[in-house]
Amino acid sequence: MNNSARHGSYRKMEKIVMLTREDHKTYAQILREELTPAFGCTEPIALAYCAAKAREVLGQMPTEVIIEASGNIIKNVKSVIVPNTGGMKGIPAAAAAGIVAGDSKACLEVIAKVTPEEQKEIAEYLNNVPFSVKAMEDGDKLDIRVTVKAKENSAVVRVSKHHTDIVYIARNGEVMLNEQDDCECAQKLAESQAAAAEQRADRSRLSIEGIVEYAKTADLSTVSDLLNRQVEYNYNIAQVGVKEDWGANVGSVLLDTYGEDVRTKARAYAAAGSDARMSGCELPVVINSGSGNQGITVSVPVIIYAKEYHKSDEELLRALLVSNLIAIHIKTGIGPLSAFCGAVSAGCAAGCAIAFLLGGGIDEVAHTLVNSIAITSGIICDGAKPSCAAKIASSVDAGILGYEMYRHGQQFYGEDGIVSK
């Protein structure tokens, strides 16, 4: 029995969704909270940030460093190169970079301005100061606690739930901050302009229908600065990844093997941006859901398609609203770190944005999302490292295939694996 006989004709899903002014405000605030610049892989940077803050609280250079971290942090830091360290990898290297040369006020750009002399100091510090690393058994999925000591003094700083959310500070046993979800840096990242905006925007307002409607009707002046920065930063690192020798050079392999059709370029450039980033490229990216790789994946394929099809700047930015918000919507229930590969949700979201960019509405976007998730949903996260680039290429390919399936009248149905209806 074929699919059409079993399930009936290919169904349309179009329906009208009206967004309120408050919905528009919330969607824009979500983007402002999420689409922030980061320098290097966000987990090592979060560790460097936490360590820099601990040194600041201590008030002197530590002579002993104790790092406690959740399993997700450990797997995402152990194999990735920490930028501006001369190629160093690992948890102690990230912490040492923050302690020696970090500026905690710069948040996710905490080690963006490390000098060559400071790189030497980081290496010397690692050789001369004892570091210990322990797994946290009772914390959040994203959890870091750095304890620093010098003579009779000590300081403890804890970051939890989000990459720059400091929830605990103590010096010599005196608690200075305890279990707060907001801090100066988090407020800076959210670019809050009122006290009410200190609390993170309500992600439960997001829906696929609402996202598509928002992309059609949003006042771009409220978010264009974020999106234009994403285009500039993320396409820049993708170009560098293609032109230079980074990581496993997945992007170059794809282009050399399959040519430069738009689908191959979309996969290749996204992969190349990740390869560069995972291998210590000293360029910033605009992140999504706390991840630079996801930020690259939701944006670069859409940029490639916009260039290929000569789309206007406005059309590109509206498509990026789709990819960014769908990725955030998917990740909201999963969390910023998990055993699930975040490139999957980002690649699926990119496919949805391409469908929207090429004239699709909720029907095209929804079917693209279901089809693409059904293809790549089983990929696990085994840490941040160069092979992320290959996973990104596969996920972008699944996103595009999901859309092409829709265009050819094909779809996955309920009871097909993860698909429920």
Task: Spell out what each predicted region is.
Residues I16-A28, M61-I73, D261-G280, S312-I330, ...:
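Acidic-glycine-rich active-site phosphate/pyrophosphate-binding loop
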Residues L19, D23-E33, C41, K105-E124, ...:
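Functionally critical mobile loop/hinge segments
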Residues Y27-T36, I73-V82, A276-I287, A327-L337, ...:
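Glycine/charged-rich beta-loop-alpha catalytic/anionic-binding loops adjacent to active sites
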Residues P37-K53, L283-S299, C341-S345:
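Conserved phosphate/anionic-ligand binding catalytic regions in large, soluble enzymes, centered on
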Residues I45-V148:
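Early transmembrane hairpin of solute transport permeases
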Residues A54-V57, P83, Y305-R318, V322, ...:
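Hydrophobic alpha-helical bundle architecture
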Residues L126-G280:
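Signature of multi-pass transmembrane helix bundles
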Residues E260-T264, R277-H310:
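Membrane-embedded translocation segments of transport machinery
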